[in-house]
């Protein structure tokens, strides 16, 4: 049988990676350049840096001195969160589209595909069904954009959106991501070769090593080292930008896509086994597991759907470790969000379709992993210095913020621009 990504992550161990930085792909030229709604400053470069899986409490001067300094010298948003489901793909989609999953088509990492009759990862370019700031800045403002994304499935989902796209390489076996060292080196090369005006970056080490950290419930040895390593590499990026005269042009928007939670080996929920044991709903639901959340898609006759869903709520809601049950409409997930969503308590995880499907200790997707760091820094004169903002912000707010900086219309987005961070 084919290993799931979470099963594979559990067996990754220590991996040595070596090789070249990789290749950069060019998107097709923009067919038309529209006039921006306001002039775009010639000296503005925007970088959206996603520190994948970083928790708000890790943004401190001991673990992440560079990021903490950037935040202290810029504007920090103290009440920032992901959108549900708190996974990588839906929150990266939210960042660049500015709209909720029901509008962009990406409610989770994994969904139940009725056509295929199985669960699958949303890693195809046509899975993303909304415009992004990567393509809009390219086509409406006539400026170069770039994506430098460490994870293979992110590169797949955003294929063709940016003017310049780095294909992550070398990929670490099992994790399907490129280490932050290679990603930052690729970013520096992309800046040197193409001078993009807006760049979308994912740094995956904190997330990947956090997933596998067997000491996650206590010392977090691997996770803490990953935070330190990533932070140092971002210091290296800053020195590069300063030495090339680009720091004064830079607006740096830094945030995570979700947090991270750790569970003991036996604190797992296997909903598939409970469904199989119940004659009323056996074979009636497909499950897409997303670590801290499961989505359930109804497979039976239409006239029995309501009764089956009521029984599913009873069965799943009674399982130890289950926190909440949602109608997907409550979370604005859209049709791919299935017919029911279950989340787990902190310190638990889902493991479906079998108890062996998700052995990794670090997971996210559930409510406790919604909190994220979020700040705006950089050397550009428009960045407000030394401020904090306590109004709620979400990953959705990145796209309208970027759109506002480049003079693009954002009235139709669900997010709100983080204008408190700028002198505009």
Regions found by a protein language model. Give the residues of each.
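Active-site nucleophile/metal-coordination loop of metallo-enzymes that catalyze phosphate/sulfate
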Residues: 38-43, 56-141, 156-159
């Amino acid at each position: 049988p084919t290993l799931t990504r979470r099963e594979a992550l559990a067996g990754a161990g220590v991996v040595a990676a070596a090789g070249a930085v990789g290749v950069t792909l060019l998107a097709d030229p923009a067919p038309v350049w529209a006039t921006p709604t306001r002039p775009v400053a010639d000296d503005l470069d925007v970088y959206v840096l996603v520190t994948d899986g970083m928790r708000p409490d890790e943004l401190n001067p001991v673990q992440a001195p560079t990021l903490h300094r950037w935040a202290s010298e810029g504007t920090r948003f103290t009440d920032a969160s992901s959108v549900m489901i708190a996974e990588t793909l839906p929150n990266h989609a939210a960042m660049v589209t500015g709209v909720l999953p029901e509008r962009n088509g990406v409610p989770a990492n994994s969904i139940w595909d009725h056509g295929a009759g199985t669960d699958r990862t949303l890693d195809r370019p046509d899975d993303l069904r909304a415009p992004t700031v990567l393509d809009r800045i390219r086509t409406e403002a006539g400026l170069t954009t770039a994506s430098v994304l460490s994870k293979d499935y992110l590169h797949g989902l955003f294929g063709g959106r940016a003017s310049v796209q780095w294909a992550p390489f070398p990929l670490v076996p099992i994790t399907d991501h490129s280490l932050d060292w290679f990603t930052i080196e690729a970013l520096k090369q992309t800046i040197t070769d193409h001078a993009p005006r807006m760049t979308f970056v994912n740094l995956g080490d904190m997330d990947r090593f956090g997933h596998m950290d067997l000491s996650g419930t206590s010392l977090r040895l691997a996770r803490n080292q990953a935070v330190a390593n990533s932070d140092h590499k971002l210091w290296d990026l800053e020195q590069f930008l300063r030495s090339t005269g680009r720091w004064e042009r830079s607006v740096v928007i830094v945030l995570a896509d979700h947090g991270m939670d750790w569970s003991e080996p036996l604190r797992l929920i296997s909903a598939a086994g409970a469904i199989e044991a119940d004659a009323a709903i056996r074979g009636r639901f497909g499950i897409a597991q997303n670590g801290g959340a499961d989505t359930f898609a109804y497979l039976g006759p239409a006239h029995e759907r309501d009764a089956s869903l009521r029984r599913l709520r009873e069965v799943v809601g009674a399982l130890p470790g289950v926190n909440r049950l949602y109608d997907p409409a409550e979370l604005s997930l859209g049709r791919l969000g299935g017919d029911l969503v279950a989340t787990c308590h902190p310190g638990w995880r889902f493991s479906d379709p079998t108890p062996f499907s998700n052995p990794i200790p670090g997971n996210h997707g559930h409510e406790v992993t919604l909190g994220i760091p979020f700040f705006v820094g950089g050397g550009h004169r428009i960045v407000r210095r030394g401020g904090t903002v306590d109004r709620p912000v979400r990953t959705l707010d990145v796209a309208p913020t970027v759109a506002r900086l480049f003079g693009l219309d954002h009235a139709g987005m669900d997010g709100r621009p983080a204008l408190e961070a700028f002198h505009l």
